[in-house]
Amino acid sequence: MKYRGFFIVVLLFGLGFSAKAQSDYFFPPNARFDKSIPTPEEYLGYPIGTLHTRHDAIVGYLRELARRSPRARLDTIGETYEHRQLVVLTVSSSANLNNLENIRRKHLELVDPTKTITDFSDQKSIVMLGYNVHGNEPSSSESALLTAYYYVAGLHAEVRQALDEAVLLIDPAFNPDGRDRHSTWANAYQGNPLVSDPVDAEHNEAWPGGRTNHYWYDLNRDWLPLAHVESQARIDFYHKWYPNVVTDFHEMGTNSTYFFEPTKPFGSENPVVPRDNYDGLNNLFAGYFHEALDEIGSLYFTKEQYDNSYPGYGSTYPDIHGALGLVFEQASSRGHLQDSRMGKVAFAFTIKNHLTSSLATVRASVAEKATLLAHMENYFDSAQKEGEQAGGGWVFGDPYDDGRNQAFVDLLLRHKIKTIALNEDISLGDKTFKKRKAYYVPNAQGQYRMVRTMFEKVTTFYDSIFYDASAWTAALAYNMPYEQYNGRNELRGAVLKRSDLQGEYASVPRAEYAYLIEWNEYYAPKALNYLLDKGLYVNSAFKPFSIETHEGVREFGYGTLMIPVARQEANSNLVHAYIEEATEIAGVKAYAVSSGYSASGIDLGSGSFETIQKPQVLMLIGPGTSSYEAGEVWHLLDSKVGLPITKVWKDNVGRIDWSQYNTLVLVSGNYSSLGENTINRIKQWVREGGTLITLRSATSWAVASGLVNGKFAEGPKRETPERMDYATARDFRGSNAIGGSMYM
């Protein structure tokens, strides 16, 4: 009866309850507020939960709180690809905000193994309340507004104590672009009266949905690789503060209830994180969560599903930085009201649960302040000692690709991992690492556990069932040559800062014959695309050679770009200017040559040089295709190459003029709707010289449809099906899937 009554309140509220009724519904009964501070409803013009709030309105309300109250300060920490602001509202007592920089500096002593702190009484709990990394899980951003109001306007004793003892960093939306994509859809299809039927358009947003960012990337997997601007801005802010507690709010299937940590024991836990994080802090905070949710009658579950192993989530990255990362999952209304097996799930109800957990998180962070601060100090102190005991470290470096080196070093430095540029050659195993292209990461540092995360190959697991990724060795992801160094003497070199990363670019003298650019450079395609855009003829070497350059005789490998000067329509001065611009933009090096006669191998006029045709790329997208893979291709060509890609909904394939394109990309998906005529047209296009690129399941479709010749190896078959218990079916399916794996 309590549960049904709860939903009736939500439904009445959704029809336009008063501001007081809204406050009574969302907040604890003892809450008192400063009437000079506007409620979210007063600012927005509608009660929270009756519409999905646009990101600009979220930012506007937080800015208004900061303008009105000495308890709040709003900072812009970055912006999305679509130029939406990434903001953090810092909330604390006015005295703390006036002393904020000193509080921050004092707090950072906890992560410095050279400092010892025994008295935490004047320290503050730093609590990062993070919301809405998946844009179509929108309830948490709404709860962020209520959380901000609660602590900025609250007058009761609990709020005053929290503001005295803690600094709250409220990040209302990790993924504003995805959120607005979803919010626009949900608001556009909202009915009056509300339609709770799960098949209604409101509850089934169009491809690609709002879960992901502008490039259709799941930002909740990006805390480790930092591929996107939102994550880069957030990680910079994270390391400015090193919060003690970080929340990560999500939504799950409508027919579920509510989840909070602890996660599934052992099998879903990261091997480098000390046990006291899971056995101690997780269980300690769980007590606060269940008490708060019990108080409002919400159903929940713990210790099932979900993952603490992959370190690139918003709830796991903090664990590897001496903090407590916390994931919360709420059954989604995916709109404003939806039927479920337990009744109707209203948007306001989902918001209230996340608000309740937010307040409980702050309550626990204040009550357990000494425990959290001691945990963080001990974490980095023990990491330093473990690293010193392990000794040595890791040496890496690609002798041929400085762009790759720079990108990987940049990732390490963003994660505050000490990295040294070696000033002498070193041989380890079967590899020789050359100075100026060799780097060393010592184990003896406070970030030792992050060092392990980036370099160690974890091949032994407690459980064979993974929620998501099963491998995350970053050095392998970069295809980086590396070896473990076990020497007793520390290797010498310059400790790097991000400002030291300059790339290979160096001004090249003007050539009258040709310029050469090595293709093994990570960003060579970017330079190539720039030159093609400028109308230059560029050739590619299909055989190696060596030749006299402005820096003496050098060897050049397969794919080397050769830009002859004489055959260009532009004069030699303009060609030189384009070469300078291209190499500076891409961070690669060009070589000037004065003769086409090689020292060995092919000459520059050889038929083994092929003229490169500028790619005109087409990719089919839309329902039935993988938005994740399509987004990866799009982001790669946009950010790494600067090459435009035409994205066409596969239902519009009949409108394509195939003569305008020379490259077709098919990501995983169902292409059965293309039909025989389209398949035959693609076959003809390939015969005429078009390049077809298929990813994953699209390759199977291409073979099955006769676009390409090929066959696949068959896996083992069971002659007699094995009987299984229904209770183990889910785990059995999971044991046959390996997510996020790396094959070496």
Residue ranges and their predicted role:
Residues Y238-M252:
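Proline-aspartate-enriched helix->loop->beta-strand connector
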Residues A148, E165-G191:
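Carboxylate/His-rich catalytic cores and anion/metal-binding grooves
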Residues M1-D24:
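Bacterial Sec-dependent N-terminal signal peptides
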Residues T184-E205, L224, H228-S231, P243, ...:
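Active-site cavity-forming subdomains of large catalytic enzyme subunits
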Residues P198-Y217, E269:
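Aromatic- and acidic-residue-enriched carbohydrate-binding clefts of CAZyme catalytic domains
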Residues P172-P176, A186, F249-T257, A698-T699:
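Short, solvent-exposed turn/loop segments enriched in Gly/Ser/Thr/Pro and often Arg
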Residues Q22-P138, L145-A166, Y215, R221-D222, ...:
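Intrinsic-disorder/low-complexity accessory segments
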